[in-house]
């Protein structure tokens, strides 16, 4: 049995990844197993930060990357590989900022996932939309981001296209097409490509 497909929904915190993932799950058949970083690790991260005396809203930076993020992403990758090796597709939902902005790192990560078909869906935003969404959801996790918002935007680059091949889903306030319509159009094009080539995909994303 070969490795099943992986769908990666990526983008900055607060950009609307979970919403995009929900729409995508409703359109895919078979339905992938969803691995959402916040669902998997949210309470564990909060406990780790508290025990280490770190700010409760800390979700990035050198300390976080070394002591927390490496284990979050390492765990998600290992579980995704194990699930898809049994023939079940997987949908990963997390920022994956470093992976999507470095082509070599992306290729290496795809291999860690088991290779095969790994499709990146990047949720596009901008600073105005991002601030609005972070303020509206009112999560303690976002306190540090809002306190130094300009620096956060500079790091996250919500409107900068990833290096890795991807499908962009526009979730800015100015978007004229709904998320579901964007996804449907992309999946329809993917299916048409598959039929035209006799069961082979030409599209990179």
Residue map of PLM features:
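Walker A/P-loop
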Residues: 18
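Glycine-rich phosphate-binding loop used to anchor ATP phosphates in small-molecule kinases
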Residues: 64-114
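Conserved phosphate-donor/acceptor-positioning beta-strand/loop module used by diverse small-molecule
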Residues: 113-135
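Small-molecule kinase domains that catalyze NTP-dependent phosphoryl transfer to phosphate-bearing small molecules
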Residues: 136-184, 188-205
